[in-house]
Amino acid sequence: MVKRVMLCMAVALMGMTANAQTNSNHLMFGVGALYEKGLEATIAYEHGSKYHNAWEYFATGYLQYDDDPNAGHVTKKSFWHNYNSWHLGIAYKPCVNRGRNHHGNVRIGASGGSDLHDFVGGVHLGYEHTYALKGGWELFFQVKEDVIIGSGLRWRTGGSVGLKLPL
């Protein structure tokens, strides 16, 4: 009798641990650098589905700085007031690499926003690798390629790093 109870408990525990990261939701914060002379910050909501696939709903702010022509170097004005844009978008992230305490996803998405003068749209393609930390927190690294439609800046490439907080 005791053996049967122990066997039932072991089977139940194995079933619970197998579903530990299915349908998990995260709040994501990330910062990154993009070529040429660009910085970005992103806040996102990620809804995980089966097998580490996920949907991401994001808001991104982008800043491109430049040298001040009068000073010959980057100044406060040339840093903050050269080119700014923001985007709201969605990305699907199918899992392509899975291992112990980490997984990798291709990131495919689209966004729309403004460069403070006109509407701009974006198509996003990249790779995100995520490492599981204690307490459900996750650390992620992204390599991204963005094609921007409707602005003078057409192509962005770079990387970002951030944290995913469990909800």
Residue ranges, per PLM feature:
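Outer-membrane beta-barrel "beta-signal"
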Residues: 154-167
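Cleavable N-terminal export/targeting peptides
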Residues: 1-24, 167
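Short loop/turn motifs that connect adjacent beta-strands in outer-membrane beta-barrel proteins
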Residues: 20-24, 50-54, 96-104, 117, ...
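Residue-level signature of outer-membrane beta-barrel architecture
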Residues: 33, 47, 92-96, 129-131, ...
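Flexible, solvent-exposed loop segments that connect beta-strands
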Residues: 22-24, 55-84, 104-106, 112-116
